[in-house]
């Protein structure tokens, strides 16, 4: 049996540091990378993608509501098409950075309130 160890990374914000992310990328199989709406920024996404590539870690988008003040934990009432657009925008941001590194986003794992709504 193969087990996929997965971790949310790149969540640079006033709430979190990314100083341990490089160490975590030595032990995980897949990384959910914050896409800038609740946390993270493009330089951080690029750094995590580069280290993931080096370590053979698959890259996933970790989209959220545009809610940095609450770290994406506050529910925002959007209709289904607005939620799809929100997720796709963040996927596209991460995918563009991944492609610059000759990588692809392989999965999407929602964050915070968005993930709670998906459950």
Regions found by a protein language model. Name each.
Residues 8-12, 34-38, 64-68, 111-113:
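Active-site beta-loop-alpha junctions enriched in small/polar residues
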Residues 13-46:
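A short alpha/beta connector and helix-capping loop motif
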Residues 3-17:
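N-terminal basic/disordered segments at the start of proteins
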Residues 68-101, 107:
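Glycine/small-residue-rich loop that forms an oxyanion/phosphate-binding "nest" at active or ligand-binding sites
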Residues 3-7, 31-33, 59-63, 106-110:
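Hydrophobic faces of well-ordered beta-strands that scaffold small-molecule active sites
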Residues 99-119:
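Hydrophobic, well-structured mid-protein blocks that either form specific transmembrane helices
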Residues 57-77, 109-114:
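Short, charge-patterned binding micro-sites
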Residues 22-26, 47-60, 99-101:
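Acidic (Asp/Glu)-rich catalytic clusters
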